[in-house]
Amino acid sequence: MFYKIKGTHDLLPTQTTSWQKVENSFHSFFKKHQFQEIRTPIMEYAEVFHRAAQHSEMVSKETYAFPDKKNRLITLRPEGTAGIVRSYIENKLDQTNKLQKFYYYGPYFRYERPQFGRYRQFHQLGVEVLGKTTPFLDIEVITLIYQFLKSLGLDDITIQINSLGSKEDHLDYVDIFKQYLKIYSNYLCGLCHERLNKNPLRIWDCKTCHLQDFLKQAPKIFDSLSPKSKKRFQTVLNGLEAMKVNFKTCHDLVRGLDYYTHTVFEITFNKMVLGGGGCYDHLVAALGGNQLSGIGFALGMERLMLTLQENNNFFVSPQPSLKLFLFILDPVFFHHGLTLVHILRNEGFCVEFNYSFTTFTKGLKEALKCLPNYLLILGHQEFAKKQITIKNIKTHTQTTIDQKDLIFYFQQQRV
């Protein structure tokens, strides 16, 4: 008789039904919000991951890597972002001048010690948005993952959030942190001695050193951020508060991959970390593409299923109907506009909106690229009067209604 490999697990029919419900809910939820599915190979050339995160312990110590018959080093993917960025560049999507919103699902592989909710072959649900990052896009992505998990019945979700600032902020802090740690080098564990020169931020994740007073009193990366980076982060926090996302700032949070910049976050339920993500300003260029930014997150499916099973919660999201685009003309109205977006989405409508602010003509062109049935315009006059202007793209007719009548108006258009 043969046995499964250590760190893997079988999903029997009694389990796959529950998994399918969550998978279908994930597909439905992010399709409704204008994300498109992407599927990349489970194997990549090892250089893809080394270029993406050369100092990461996941890449240097936990990957399944082997030479093929032509002696090229192949790696079973340990995470989703690098392979998706490789595909984004190889297929010239970085040259389209269009924001690309992907979602993905599949198996991943890491050679680490198996424990509760953690396997050597595991599954992730994830999202990557490539082409730009703005604080408003950070708000959107974090709000969506928060609302997706709440749609599954997980009401006690907390987003642990921090900012790593720009690349320049990051480098300044690393110098300060390394100088500080040299004083206490005798107190570092063996692994953290290695980290000190390769990836010192990972010392914050050490379960041994983290308990010691010298690390508790160490300078935090947030203190090294430029005023511009701090302002960006505060914009994100203000937006999450406006969207009633339960979050907690955590200046010890650094994440395990060294390509992150600015916003980083982890998704927790009680004490269980379900996943995490963040922004990356230089990853696309590092893999040979244009200088473009992105933001993404991944959820561990195994951990999510354990959490759902403990709470007996499963929910399948409804399919979207009409396709709407809310054109917010001024960032002053952003929080109000985003609230309207989610009111409509919660009624099953497919709604997109602008993440950045430019001239009316350019903004209108970007809106029409999404091929909406209706264009909703929120300008100064509409905001002041609590109204919204609605343009039917097909008939070219236009009307202005009170915002409180939005749901009723579009329910009538469904008939």
Swiss-Prot record:
Gene Ontology annotations for the cellular component aspect, listed alphabetically: cytoplasm
Cell location: Cytoplasm
Alphabetically ordered keywords of this record: Aminoacyl-tRNA synthetase, ATP-binding, Cytoplasm, Ligase, Nucleotide-binding, Protein biosynthesis
Enzyme Commission code(s) on record: 6.1.1.21
The organism's place on the tree of life at top rank: Bacteria
Major localisation: cytoplasm
GO-annotated molecular function: ATP binding; histidine-tRNA ligase activity
Gene3D superfamilies: Anticodon-binding domain, Bira Bifunctional Protein, Domain 2
GO biological process, one term: histidyl-tRNA aminoacylation
Keyword DNA-binding: no
A Pfam family assignment: HGTP_anticodon
Reaction(s) the record says it catalyses: tRNA(His) + L-histidine + ATP = L-histidyl-tRNA(His) + AMP + diphosphate + H(+)
Record note on quaternary structure: Homodimer.
PANTHER family to which the protein is assigned, alphabetical: HISTIDINE--TRNA LIGASE, MITOCHONDRIAL-RELATED, HISTIDYL-TRNA SYNTHETASE
Protein name listed in UniProt: Histidine--tRNA ligase
